[in-house]
Amino acid sequence: VPLIASTPVTVCPPASTTLDAHAGASFGVQSVCRTLADANATLERFAWLGDQLAIAVWTRDIDVAETAYDHPGHHTLSCYIDGGYRTERQKIPGRFGAPQRLCALPGDHESRWWVRGHMHFLHLYFLPEHFTRRAVLELDREPRELTLADRTYFEDPRIAALCQSLAQLPWDGIDERLRANEISHEVLSLLLRGQSVRRENAVIKGGLAVSTRRRLRDYIDANLTETLTLGELSNVACLSEFHLARMFRTSFGMPPHAWIAQQRIDRARGLLRATALPLEQVAALCGFANGSHFSHRFRAAAGASPLAYRRAMTPA
């Protein structure tokens, strides 16, 4: 369930740049990536994958050091590739890392670690908003009640295998980054189903009734080929335009126009992967005005043209 890219939020810079030159507006000095860089970990590879997803491979070799994460503002999935046998999280003594072991670190978490010896690991960085939209689409859940669980050294063979695939992919070319993007979204879906929890003391106030949220979600999906307006959606919800705009954002995690735009891009991705339809027909089926409008919007969202995306997603 990709997020349409706006201005990228900088979690971590490419290896050839400095951290200070790439401090993001939403992720500040406490980001996991910056913390590791300040701890003299070696950033071997880094890439933006589109949809405000970032990926990195790190190496650390040290006798012993303490590393602390403090409300990084973004979620992190860590998968150990090699080593980590003597690294442990404080307050969970005696539980150590190992290849294919995973850690899920929510954006609002705090943790302190004793790092010892060699470790080689992959990080996938993503935003809380990735869970918000998936909660509605994949689980039909109230998005405000779910968040990523704080997990240390859990095992999930499916997620670990996907992380190994990500680590083995080159990230230099557009095709490879697109494939990495698809794998990353598969990882996020598995995390949502297996490593999400209800927010502690979650009090859900305001927003749309569950039945209204479902009715709007289904109506939008059934009418993506049309020009959907706020007035039309307000009639479906039996609310004024003013109240719908406010309540929609609360219950869907984004305003109506952004949700509709995301749905159009999602449908386009599916059609490009599964069919050989001409681009003009794909554009029409997804509600874009014309092929040019579709190509422009798709490139902004996916980081590649529709043709490049289709080529990357077509098995060799």
Regions found by a protein language model. Name each.
Residues 2-49, 59-61:
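Membrane-cytosol interface segments
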Residues 13, 139-201:
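Amphipathic alpha-helical segments enriched in hydrophobic/aromatic residues interleaved with Lys/Arg
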Residues 33-144, 173, 177:
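N-terminal regulatory/effector-sensing and dimerization cores
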Residues 160-171, 217, 221-224, 269-273:
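Regular secondary-structure segments
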Residues 190, 194, 215-266, 283-308, ...:
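Basic/polar phosphate-binding segments, predominantly the helix-turn-helix DNA-binding elements
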Residues 198-204, 250-252:
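Short, Lys/Arg-enriched N-terminal segment that forms or immediately precedes the first helix
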Residues 227, 276-277:
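Residue at a beta-strand N-cap/secondary-structure junction
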